[in-house]
Amino acid sequence: MIKKDPIELFDLWYNEVLAVSLQDKKDPTAMVLATCSKDLKPSARVVLLKKYSDQGFVFFTNMNSRKGKEMAENPSVALVFDWSRISKQVRIEGRIKMLPCNDADEYYASRPRGSQIGAWCSKQSSVLENREDFVELIKEMTIKFHEKPIPRPDYWVGIVVVPMLMEFWQEGLNRIHTRYQYTRDSNNMDKWNVVSLYP
């Protein structure tokens, strides 16, 4: 039966793969994030889903990285969840918006201190000329922030992917897969139109 709300279906599948992941230790929050620069060069990488709701899918990143710069140039992105161990996949197309600063601050403060310091020291996606210098900088910053709260760098932000299209794929016998595609109504963001696609 096709559900009217794709977030409800996502939640159902996510909890299914989460139960399996408790046994096989594979991270169900891993998702491929595809971005595209203003000169139409695509790139993709794996990031981690931190939360989701009717408002969208949240992850955190360094906006000075390649993906950050590309999202600043072109806010249209795509996500893919490959949940092969339950024979399912979810594909999402949407646009990004920034998570409020206080939400980013709250999540940043919950991270291990080593990860917080790493966010200050890593010039993500830039050429690393000397790894020893990088390690030394981490040591210096560790001393600087010893027994002090570590503030969130301005460039380290939360991103919400607001879905405009969601496709759910389920493996079938003899490659007769099941595919449901949900698209948001352009006149009513609370309304989704759903169709079944050929495999």
Curated annotation (Swiss-Prot):
Substrate binds at K50, Y107, R111, S115, R175, I176, H177. Homodimer. InterPro entries: Pyridox_Oxase, Pyridox_Oxase_CS, Pyridox_Oxase_N, Pyridoxamine_oxidase_dimer_C, Split_barrel_FMN-bd. Pfam families: PNP_phzG_C (PF10590), PNPOx_N (PF01243). One of its GO terms (biological process) is pyridoxine biosynthetic process. Catalyzes the oxidation of either pyridoxine 5'-phosphate (PNP) or pyridoxamine 5'-phosphate (PMP) into pyridoxal 5'-phosphate (PLP). Its EC number is 1.4.3.5. PANTHER family: PYRIDOXINE-5'-PHOSPHATE OXIDASE, PYRIDOXINE-5-PHOSPHATE OXIDASE. This is Pyridoxine/pyridoxamine 5'-phosphate oxidase. The gene is pdxH. HAMAP family: PdxH. Belongs to the pyridoxamine 5'-phosphate oxidase family. GO terms for molecular function: FMN binding; pyridoxamine phosphate oxidase activity. It catalyses: pyridoxamine 5'-phosphate + O2 + H2O = pyridoxal 5'-phosphate + H2O2 + NH4(+); pyridoxine 5'-phosphate + O2 = pyridoxal 5'-phosphate + H2O2. Its cofactor is FMN.
